[in-house]
Every structure is written in C-alpha cells, then in structure tokens.
Amino acid sequence: MSKTSADIIIIGGGAAGLMAAAGAARTLSAKKPEAKVIVLEKMPRPGRKIMITGKGRCNFTNLKNWNEFSEHVHPKPGFLKPSFYNLTSEKMIDYLTDAGMESVVERGDRAFPASHLASDVVDALVGSAEYAGAEVLCGKEVNKISHAEDAEERYTVACNDGSIYTSRKLIICTGGLSYPKTGSTGDGYRWAKEMGHSIKALFPSLTAIVPSGYKDVTPLSKEKSVVKGHIDRSTPLAETGSMLCGNQLKNVGLSIVIDGNIADEEFGDLDFTDGGLEGPIGFKMSRKCVNALINGSKVVAVIDMKPAVEIEDLQVRIATLWNEIAKDKRSANKLYKDRFRILLTKVLPMQLIPAFVKLNPNADHKTLAKTLKAWKMEIEGFVGYERCVVTAGGVNIEEITPKTLESRLIPGLYFAGEVIDLDGDTGGYNLQIAFSTGYLAGMSAARQLIY
C-alpha cells in the first residue's frame, strides 16, 4: 500500500480540475517551488467530457462581457463574479494561446479551437498544468476521503488501487452526473455530504425535452430513473417522433408555458432529434422544463414558425396565397386537402409538412396563420443524465465562500466546476464556469499555504 504526501490534492481531471492544478502550481512556484500539487483522475485520460463538448469541436468559452455573460448563469450568477473577473473569457483565450492553441470566435461570441478539435483544448490544459509543476495521475478512482482538523495533513484520500494520498488542502472538481461514461458519476456530491455540506436538488439541464407521443414509451417511475419524467433516449421513436426527427427549424420563436403561464420565450434555431426538441433554444429552455416536470407541473412548448410576421399580416398573406391557388387551373379542381397541402408548401419546409398535418388535424386555410404562430406541443418528459450536457443543482453555494471557493464549514476544502450549484446555458458558458472557478480555487488554496 503506497502513501504519498502532497500540499494540494485535486480530485477530478476535467476542466475545473486541470485549471485548479495550474492555478495552484503557478501560485506556489514563486514562493514555495517545492510544494506538491497532485490531480487524481479516475479515467485512463484526463478531460474525457471536454472531448465530446460541441460534438467534438469544443465551444470552450463565450466572449460576452460580465453583464451579458451573467444572464446565462443559474441560479445565482453573482456567486461566479469573483471567479469570472479573476479569469475572464478573454484571459482564458490568452491562457490557451500561451499553451500553443489558437482560437476562433463564431456567431454568438462562441470561441472554439482553430482546429475545431476538442483534443487540442485538453492537450493545452494538461500541458499547462504539468508545465506549471502539477502532477496529473490517471486511473486513480477515489473511494474514500477523510479529514482530521488537528493534523497538518488533514486530508487523506484512498484510491481503489490501494494507494493513499494525504494533503493540507483538498479541491473537489468531480463534475456532475451528466455523461457518466466520461467519469461523471456524482462522487463529489456524496463526499461533500459526508463532510457536512448540503446538496441542492440535482436534475438534468441542456437536454432534449420530449413532446407527448414523441417516444414509444411512458415516463419511467422514480424507482427506475434518477428523476421523474426521464425518458430513455434509446427507446424507439413513436410515429410523431419519426415524422419530426431530422427537421431543423431556423429563426423560430419558442415559448414555454408552465401551468398556463408563459415562463420563458426565445428566438433562434430548434432541432427535432431522436431525443426530442434540442438545438440552441430547445436546450436553453430545458432547464425550466425539466424542473417544472419534476415538480408535477404541466408544460407546453409553443413554436412560432413566423416570428418576424404579425399574425394579421400573416393572415393576409395566406389568404392571398389561397386565392392564387384557387385561381390556378392546375389546382382548381383538386380536393380541398390537396389544395391545402399546396398552401403548406409555400409557408413550411417540405419535410415538415407530414408531421404538421398529423399534429394539427383541424388546421385549414382560415386557421393556418394562428396555428403557425402558436404550434403547441405538450411536453411529457426529458432525456436524462446519459445525454444531458450539464447537471443543475449541486453543493450549496451558500456554504462556499465566493471569493476563494473554500468551504465555509471545513477549512482547507474547496469546490469548483459542475459539482457546485452553478450551471450555464449552451454557448460556452459551462466550460468557462469550470475554468474560472477551478483556477480561483487552485490559487486560493495555494495562497493559504504561502501566507
């Protein structure tokens, strides 16, 4: 049984953990170069979840200023402010540039590696941490953490391979529950709870929301699922899902109605996938939808297919088109349903028409404008942790000092990244949250060792 002593141990070699390692090692290098910083990562390689971010392209940050950035952070963006100003989005780009990775900025202020390879981000993060002096150890699955307040090395970390590590400071950067195959299995929540911290309710966010009848299943019971309303992504699509799957709607409006009240409205792109409603605005709306479904509320998604046109103008346009179709000799003698389909081809994408007709059986040329402006779909469930982008909820931020990320309950214990009750919208926000909180936690732990 091997035993290794360190000054700072970081559990988790993801975005937050690698930045915590760099922040700690860089801070220690000037005043305490002999100090030892160790990252314990249970997977064979670090940064596994980063590798699948943005479908492998890795939208690693967003260049919006704090006022705009904070609007995309939940539930209390103010908690992030000290971390963000310590390591802003611009500073993060400079950090990666110094590590040899060039970046490009695309629509919506989203930053990507110029190569469009997530592996370049991981290589830069690992390289920077190791260059600063941190040691990144993989295949180290932690099974127990203990702490003794009266000991100099107050934290003892035991791994499944029998190795034991002791340290003066401990930073937990274990991520959430999303994409468990990447190593995010919620271990940090258990350890935090064992050490006296409370955990805010966990639920999937940035995930597909599933309209009624979309999947050939009913929602699973609590006993069979991590959350009520979860729908297995692998279940076959029902007829509705099969007809809608693959359609990508550009520049549409989406409103979410919860128990009869409009909870949120967005404009942008919406995708129908094998999971349900996704795409930028689908993902952004999912946080409120999932939370509402878990609490037993009725959720309805309302799609505005023509958000740039007022309903009165759309009615006039459709009436004009209908009259033109009626006067056309080629369609004048056709059945009503055939003429109506001709009308639909002029206002909807061709591939969407079969599903639209199926889901709106009572629509006709007189009511079409109203239906296009408010295509309603009741939401019955959501795709769970196996495919959601981020976990909402986590270690209670009221029990963490925002200026240092140190526990208010246990000295020398720090938290960073997805494990804490802080999450963002799609668009590079979540990785920046991880980078900023990780770096500040590492710096703070190191400063306590120096001063």
Predicted feature descriptions by range:
Residues 9, 25-55:
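Glycine-rich FAD pyrophosphate-binding loop
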Residues 169-217, 234, 238:
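Glycine-rich loop(s) and the adjacent beta-strand/alpha-helix scaffold that form part
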Residues 45, 66-68, 76, 85, ...:
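Residue-level recognition of phosphate/Mg2+-coordinating polar/acidic sites
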Residues 129-142, 202:
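A conserved beta-strand/loop element that lines the FAD pocket in flavoprotein oxidoreductases
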Residues 42-74:
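Conserved N-terminal glycine-rich FAD pyrophosphate-binding loop of Rossmann-like flavoproteins
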Residues 2-16:
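Beta1/beta-strand and adjacent pyrophosphate-binding region of the FAD-binding site
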Residues 138-153:
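A conserved short coil-to-beta-strand element within the FAD-binding core of flavoproteins
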Residues 9-11, 40, 142, 164-181, ...:
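Short hydrophobic core segments
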